[in-house]
C-alpha cells in the first residue's frame, strides 16, 4: 500500500527512473522539480550526490538550514510503494509573495506512469494532517487553469476556490480533516 516517507537513499534507483519520466514529459519551467533537475539531474546517479540531495531535503524543514534567498522552510515527502517512487509532495511552512500568488503551501507531482490511479488525491489528503502539525490551519494549493485532473484532486480534498491569478487557480483547503 502506498505511503509517505521522508526522502531516503534506498529509493535511489526508482527515483532516477521517475526523473527520466518527468524529463521525457517536459517539466514545468516554474516547478521545484525542474529547478532540482537543473541543479542535480546530471549527477543524481552518483550515490554520494544523491545522498547529499536526500540529506538536504530532510534538512529543509529547519529554520536554520541555508537556502536560496526568498525560499521558505518546507517538508518534502516521497510517496512510495515498497521501494517504488510514485511521487513527491512539498509543504511550504509559510508563504512568501511568489507562493502567495502562484505556488501555494503544497506542491505535488506524481510520476507519469503512476498517474490516474488516485495517488495525487491520496497524497494531498494524507498531507493535510502533516500541514496541521506544522501549524497551518489551512493551506493554499494552486494548479494551472488548464490542469483539470489537479483541480479535481484539490476539490476532492475540500478546496475552496478563492480566485485565478497568473494562469493559476488558487484554492484554500482546511487541514482539520
Task: List each model region and its residues.
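Conserved GNAT acetyl-CoA-binding A-motif
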Residues: 131-142
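GNAT-family acyltransferases
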Residues: 1-105, 130, 166-177
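Short aromatic/hydrophobic contact patches that present stacked aromatics
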Residues: 3, 107, 140-142
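Conserved beta-strand-loop-alpha-helix junction that forms the acyl-donor binding cleft
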Residues: 141-149
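Ligand-binding pocket scaffold of soluble enzyme catalytic domains
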Residues: 128, 146, 161
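Conserved catalytic-core motifs of GNAT/GCN5-like acyltransferases
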Residues: 142, 155, 160-174
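Mobile, glycine-rich extracellular loop/lid and propeptide segments
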Residues: 89, 115, 144
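Conserved acetyl-CoA-binding loop-helix of GNAT-fold acetyltransferases
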Residues: 107-110, 116-133, 151-156
